[in-house]
């Protein structure tokens, strides 16, 4: 069947605390194998409001896999083999931004990958797959905006309003979200994020997605003031 006429199948990867999806009709667990190794768990298939879905718990049911033990390539490959056409990855987060309270959703529309010590490509030598480069930034940004950036609605929690924001993500390895000192060097990344995503980099977030830390960064609203008055840029000119 042509890709243009394929029935869309939404794949959802659940993070910590998200091990299934309530309300799925015809729910059934399906085993899918991958040549990239062990998949985190079986895939839960079903339909929700007429949309076919496939759910995969990133850490396995019962949270049996540490972030460093998750085979991310195998998970993505298994969802593709299950017929998934698009993937939504959900993760629990801790915010570093005062204007992002609990209950806020952030959909990253740009990212800067600073991770290491993990396989990142499906096209290593000997894979037998044709490898070609394609632009990802515009594609990611466009899909993210269409999928909900700037939207709002009602949260399942009584009395809580659900807001959705966009932003640029910086991916770093590690799990340090509970360290208060992690908030100290944020200014060092602000200018870098501004060059990547412009004014859309308005949110800061510490995100434990895919075993790595995500920080959504915002450019400063005004130049930092030096002692004695004047900005740093003005001081350099003097």
From Swiss-Prot:
Provide the GO biological process annotations: L-methionine salvage from methylthioadenosine; nucleoside metabolic process
Compositionally biased region (Low complexity): 152-161
Which keywords accompany this UniProt record?
Glycosyltransferase, Transferase
Pfam family of the protein (one): PNP_UDP_1
Q: Which InterPro entries does the UniProt record give? A: MTAP (IPR010044), Nucleoside_phosphorylase_d (IPR000845), Nucleoside_phosphorylase_sf (IPR035994), Purine_phosphorylase-2_CS (IPR018099)
Q: Name one GO molecular function term.
A: S-methyl-5-thioadenosine phosphorylase activity
GO CC terms on record? cytosol
Composition bias, kind Basic residues: at what positions?
207-238
Instruction: Give me the ranges of the annotated region Disordered.
Output: 123-167, 180-238
Give the family, as the similarity comment puts it. Belongs to the PNP/MTAP phosphorylase family.
Task: Cite the PANTHER family for this sequence.
Answer: S-METHYL-5'-THIOADENOSINE PHOSPHORYLASE (PTHR42679:SF2)
| Protein known as | Uncharacterized 25.8 kDa protein in petC 3'region
């Amino acid at each position: 069947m042509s890709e243009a006429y394929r029935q869309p199948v939404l794949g959802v990867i659940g993070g910590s605390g998200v091990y299934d999806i309530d309300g799925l009709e015809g729910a059934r667990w399906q085993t899918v194998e991958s040549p990239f190794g062990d998949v985190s768990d079986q895939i839960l298939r079903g339909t929700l409001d007429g949309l076919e879905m496939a759910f995969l718990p990133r850490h396995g049911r019962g949270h049996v896999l540490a972030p460093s033990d998750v085979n991310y390539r195998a998970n993505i490959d298994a969802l593709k083999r299950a017929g998934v056409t698009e993937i939504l990855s959900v993760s629990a987060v801790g915010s570093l931004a005062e204007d992002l309270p609990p209950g806020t959703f952030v959909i990253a529309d740009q990212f800067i990958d600073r991770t290491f010590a993990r396989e990142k490509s499906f096209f290593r030598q000997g894979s037998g797959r044709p490898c070609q480069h394609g632009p990802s930034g515009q594609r990611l940004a466009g899909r993210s905006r269409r999928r909900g950036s700037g939207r709002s609605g009602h949260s399942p929690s009584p009395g809580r309003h659900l807001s959705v924001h966009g932003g640029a993500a910086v991916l770093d390895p590690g799990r340090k979200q509970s360290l208060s000192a992690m908030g100290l060097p944020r200014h060092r990344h602000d200018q870098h994020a501004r060059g990547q995503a412009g004014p859309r980099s308005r949110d800061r977030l510490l995100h434990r997605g895919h075993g790595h830390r995500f920080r959504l960064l915002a450019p400063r609203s005004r130049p930092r003031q030096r002692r004695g008055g004047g900005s740093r840029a003005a001081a350099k000119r003097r």
